Regions:
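Cysteine-nucleophile active-site neighborhood
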Residues: 227-228, 233-304
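RNA-binding accessory domains that recognize and position tRNA/RNA substrates
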Residues: 2-215, 219, 224, 238
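Ser/Thr-centric signal marking residues that sit
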Residues: 116, 301, 310
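Short solvent-exposed loop/turn micro-motifs enriched in small/polar/acidic residues
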Residues: 1-2, 283
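Short, solvent-exposed coil/turn elements at secondary-structure transition points
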Residues: 116, 193, 215-217, 264, ...
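Conserved functional loop/turn residues at catalytic and ligand-binding sites
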Residues: 206, 225, 255, 310
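Single conserved hydrophobic/aromatic residue that forms the stacking wall/gate
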Residues: 304-315, 320-324
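Glycine-rich, phosphate-binding/catalytic loops in enzymes
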Residues: 205-206, 246-248, 323-324
Length: 324
């Protein structure tokens, strides 16, 4: 079978030629890199990557295949996938489909056999930028660069309303090896693009979970008499989400315990008077070392930031300063 060609074009005019490992066609979005060494299926299905083309810095991808359980949502949300090398074999007892077929079945473009170290350095030095992947025959480089430049970035885009659940639902499933704690807390979850594993971990704590759409109003949330409200992860720019900021403000005024992660963390900061600004390049990955300057201990973390100078006084210290 003849291999299809593909190119990745950046808005700065840089071209990478490689092999197509997914669907044929064309797509654009914001290109980012993720430093995780595993979990590529979870990354692909994480709603936080909506409208982004994800570059995996680890060079060898696909060796464990894919399955129908290790997903963070019901579909692939990222616009495209960029890797250095696609494994030609899959070795895992839970494998059900190889990565290439998985991408094709979900109509997602992917490109391999490019210099991902060079690409990552460009993103690191120049910042996240628009990009495009074109896969198939008779690809024109100028057209690919033009397609990349058509994407205007994520600033100002409210993507939470596109990835959120349409109707409320309950969640009880825990992690597959987890043992549920015995608690009686009821938690309302505002879904801005929540990952299933976050819900599983919360369920392991014994929480009674009710998940609500992103635009759920204050009155409906408190109608279930929750002990707290969880503000989920999600994609896009937090500032256009006025509906969520308004609801969160009312919750804080009521004294409701709140916990935000990713987009939810940024929305909580905005509701309390903080500010967010786009980072030069995002800290995507689960393997970022952070040292506690008091204890000298190092933790390996996923990072979420707000601008330290704008941190509201009523938010305690001890977190990691930065930007979104």
């Amino acid at each position: 079978m003849k291999e299809s060609t593909a190119i990745l074009a950046l808005a700065n005019g840089t071209i990478f030629k490689g092999k197509s490992i997914g669907a044929e066609g064309q797509v654009n979005g914001e290109i980012v890199f993720n430093t995780s060494m595993s979990g590529y299926q979870e990354i692909l299905t994480d709603p936080s990557y909506a409208r982004q083309i994800v570059t995996l810095t680890y060079p060898h991808i696909g060796n464990t295949g894919t399955n129908f359980e290790d997903t963070e949502s019901e579909k692939i949300w990222c616009s495209g996938l960029v890797i250095r090398s696609l494994s030609q074999t899959e070795s895992n007892w839970r494998n059900e489909e190889n990565l290439s077929d998985y991408l094709k079945r979900n109509n997602i473009l992917g490109i391999s056999d490019i210099d991902t170290r060079k690409l990552t350095r460009i993103i690191r030095n120049e910042g996240s930028q628009s990009a495009a992947i074109i896969a198939g025959e008779d690809i024109e480089e100028d057209s690919a660069v033009s397609l990349a430049r058509e994407f205007q970035g994520l600033n100002g885009l409210d993507l939470a309303k596109e990835v959120t659940t349409k109707t409320p639902y309950d969640w009880t499933e825990g992690t597959w090896r987890g043992k549920k704690a015995n608690t009686n807390f009821k938690v309302a979850v505002l879904d801005f693009g929540i990952k299933k594993n976050i819900l599983r971990i919360l369920a392991d704590r014994g929480y009674e979970l009710r998940i609500f759409p992103a635009k759920t109003e204050f009155e409906e949330l408190i109608s279930i008499n929750p002990d707290g409200v969880f503000l989920s992860n999600g994609p896009g720019d937090p500032e256009p989400c006025d509906y969520a900021i308004d609801t969160i403000t009312k919750l804080t005024e009521r004294g409701m315990p709140l916990f935000g992660i990713c987009l939810g963390h940024q929305l909580l900061a905005l509701s309390l008077g903080g500010q967010t600004s786009k980072m030069k390049f995002g800290h995507h990955g689960a393997n970022h070392p952070v040292q506690d300057l008091k204890t000298q201990k190092v933790a390996v973390l996923s990072l979420i930031h707000i601008s330290e100078p704008t941190r509201p006084e009523r938010i305690g210290g001890g977190g990691v300063g930065g930007e979104k």
